């Protein structure tokens, strides 16, 4: 249901106020393509395998997370942020801590076009890999500090995920109550 995408988007945008979602079963029967179960036929017709999640932040801000198991491959950016003066695009997987490409349309600076910043800042070790939340949590407990992914943030992402089935069933936008 997109836990990584939801966590990344809410880390950048903050807590959402509402969620809407469409979910579909696109491939009710799958055939495993590798490993010990290669060739095994698997029924996958109980829950959606594709979700398009829309988060409403108010004040004209929104985010969309397209997630699921129906994509075989994609060359689309892992994350794009569209703003009034340009776009920030992350083409590499988030676990590699990619340097974004930036499209800027600024009359003030007489710039229009794509650019890739040089010499990216080195990220702190606590946020530089996919399992960082576990190491960060242990570090926070040991040093009595707040983890990067706070319990309140995790609770907010969990609330979004819990409201998604209801939003799909009712075909409407659901209010969110938690924040971080």
Predicted regions and their residues:
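Generic structural signal for secondary-structure transition and capping sites
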Residues: 14-17, 62, 86, 146, ...
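C-terminal helix-rich "cap/oligomerization" subdomain common to oxidoreductases
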Residues: 136-180
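NAD(P)-dinucleotide binding in Rossmann-like oxidoreductases
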Residues: 42-49, 58-132
């Amino acid at each position: 249901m997109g836990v990584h995408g939801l966590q990344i988007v809410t880390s950048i945008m903050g807590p959402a106020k509402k969620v809407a979602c469409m979910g579909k079963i696109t491939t009710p029967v799958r055939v495993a393509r590798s490993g010990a179960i290669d060739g095994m036929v698997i029924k996958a017709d109980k829950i959606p395998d594709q979700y398009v999640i829309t988060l409403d932040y108010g004040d004209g801000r929104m985010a969309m997370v397209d997630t699921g198991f129906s994509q075989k491959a994609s060359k689309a950016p892992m994350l794009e942020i569209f703003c009034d003066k340009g776009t920030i695009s992350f083409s590499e997987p988030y676990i590699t801590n990619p340097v974004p490409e930036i499209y800027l349309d600024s009359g003030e600076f007489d710039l229009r076009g794509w650019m890739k910043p040089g010499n990216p800042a080195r990220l702190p070790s606590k946020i530089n890999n996919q399992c960082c939340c576990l190491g960060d949590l242990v570090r926070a407990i040991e040093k009595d500090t707040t983890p990067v992914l706070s319990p309140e943030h995790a609770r907010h992402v969990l609330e979004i995920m819990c409201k998604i089935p209801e939003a799909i069933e009712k075909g409407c936008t659901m209010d969110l109550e938690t924040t971080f």
